[in-house]
Amino acid sequence: MSAVTRCEDGLVLRLYIQPKASRDCIVGLHGDEVKVAITAPPVDGQANSHLVKFLGKQFRVAKSQVAIEKGELGRHKQVKIIHPQQIPPEIAALTE
């Protein structure tokens, strides 16, 4: 499975998360995953909720349309974006 996969109702992303970064950004490929840096610490689900909020802004969807399918407690996650309104250039480059 690749880092970004299209499905019938959106995108499935395989992510590697770097918590406590200096800024929120999509870094690029990290092996066969997309590396995402977020400022939140990995404590009490703060990083997960911050990741959902960040991805919602990047894809211009509501937080309820961003679902963490796998990896709630780890750095390696599988996230589904339902009906993205916009695809960030870093992700668009990987889907071609």
Swiss-Prot record:
Gene Ontology CC terms, in alphabetical order = cytoplasm
Pfam families assigned to the protein according to its UniProt record, in alphabetical order: DUF167 (PF02594)
Would you identify the family this protein belongs to, as annotated? Belongs to the UPF0235 family.
Entry protein name: UPF0235 protein YggU
The species is Salmonella arizonae (strain ATCC BAA-731 / CDC346-86 / RSK2980)
Cite the source lineage.
Answer: Bacteria, Pseudomonadati, Pseudomonadota, Gammaproteobacteria, Enterobacterales
Whichever gene encodes this chain, its name is yggU
